[in-house]
């Protein structure tokens, strides 16, 4: 009997082993795919998330996180998700061709997500060789350029295609072949002006925001009966808003903000009853609001900065004169027609030129030998003349001393030796340059007190008509102008999307009895006139514009500005003056940090803090800004109100969701995912930790905000409503 029991126990154990064996083998990756993953690690140049991989790594058992995930089935990789935090391209030896060639070896992939990893270059045509099972492809926040290859439409099983925030340009290929596609996100590129030729009929979410699409809103959209979210904001669409757009049966979220749309909003009783958010702000619309929205309290309608007739409404102050919109609309239409004619003319000219070229080639061949001889002789002569000129080339630099101007000569440096950041312009900015003191005196009306807009900060206007601010920093006498000039290279690098960028500088010397007697550096920066975050949080009219997605966009803009100051220049800039007064917003609500530390160790005043202390102090100040963004309350960093509010938020995380919701700014009610709000609050509290060693790094700050934005986007695109922001 005892022997029988042992036998039964052994049999059960053996059967259990056989039962578990398949599941173990399913998670054991075949050796060829293990080698492929190590190749991918190498091509991505060992990002932090993948740095621990080795030949002995059991990839299928690696723990998942929001930034990393590998799933296996039957010995094959079915999902590869890697999210980095690179803000610059991978070094020159990187090859997108090589990377995607390696990726094709993962033949069973269903999900491929490579985000913020510095991938650059064109998207190669071998993308067609990716797994035929691929359902989700996310290559967002990289530096991929060129056209989107037409081969991408051969990935028949794709349900989600996200290529947002890259450098794609030109037209979008025909996507009708992607019959299973439900999500298409091409936002934040340079696509256009032609719109997408044909779209997949089963699309649920489309984002084409922040591109250069022009002409009218395409008629083909009216066939997308399953469409729930459509974001065409920040493009150049013209014409009127088509009536069918408000009648799409499933549409919940529609953003047409920041285009050139004109005419009146469709006044139709057929307005979609499911529509929750309609954002038509910053267009050229006239007339009245649609009557079909008057009885729909559940619909949020954003319409600021148009020319609408809304007398009696608080938003009337945010409407422009009708004549402004009418004139701008005419110019927009004329520009589109001009572009179309130019394109047609170029096509005609191409045909004519082709015939001419064939005839001319024969003549060119006959005379080319003679010309070549003449050119060689001419080049020798010009070279002998140019070489001494290059050595003696001088520029006149004006240096003012009290009321007397003296002119001294300074050799212009060889442009090949000038730092790249000083030679090349950042998008939207003029190239960095050295100003004369005379130019700045003229721009500021001799530093008139009427132009003073802050401590030692003047607003002015350059001769070219560019509005600027001039920041005056008095320097220690012991530092010579020559030594200071060597420090200017760092200044030239302070040019970033989320900074009030430096346009140039001037080092001048005034005599005694002048406010800036001695050596002074004058730093010329952008002028941002749309107000600060403080203005938006204290003016209830402006505050209404800042819904949750816009606030998250502002938060990550601040974080990326700080990240650039810490890691985008060498040495990093720490201990910055981070307050909501210094978070400026341009007309598109893009963040521009001002008042940050200028890296001049020789300036009068305290030295910069150490890197670690300065970073943690910046993170703390960011936490204070984040608390104000969440609650809508303006508070001081060292106030008791901050401590009390922090404690309330901490306690609310352990309570019912309604408690935390009650602490959020009422202006964002109904526009956020609760999980996005909760995660943001948790992270803000971590930034305010008394023990600075426990505060997150700025890289953690950016990563966590990206995660909260992803949570918000998922909530928006799945079953709820949302708002389009410049970073979302």
Curated annotation (Swiss-Prot):
GO terms for cellular component: membrane. SUPFAM superfamilies: L domain-like, Protein kinase-like (PK-like). Gene3D superfamilies: Phosphorylase Kinase, domain 1 (3.30.200.20), Ribonuclease Inhibitor (3.80.10.10), Transferase(Phosphotransferase) domain 1 (1.10.510.10). The keyword ATP-binding applies. Residues 421-709 form the Protein kinase domain. Residues 1-27 form the signal peptide. LRR repeats lie at residues 74-96, 106-130, 131-155, 157-178, 179-202, 204-224, 225-248, 249-272, 274-295. It catalyses: L-seryl-[protein] + ATP = O-phospho-L-seryl-[protein] + ADP + H(+); L-threonyl-[protein] + ATP = O-phospho-L-threonyl-[protein] + ADP + H(+). Glycans are attached at residues 55, 85, 138, 169, 210, 253, 267. Keywords: ATP-binding, Glycoprotein, Kinase, Leucine-rich repeat, Membrane, Nucleotide-binding, Receptor, Repeat, Serine/threonine-protein kinase, Signal, Transferase, Transmembrane, Transmembrane helix. One of its GO terms (molecular function) is protein serine/threonine kinase activity. Its EC number is 2.7.11.1. It is a single-pass type I membrane protein. Residues 28-356 are extracellular. Pfam families: LRR_1 (PF00560), PK_Tyr_Ser-Thr (PF07714). Residues 378-728 are cytoplasmic. Belongs to the protein kinase superfamily. Ser/Thr protein kinase family. This is Probable LRR receptor-like serine/threonine-protein kinase At1g14390. It comes from Arabidopsis thaliana.
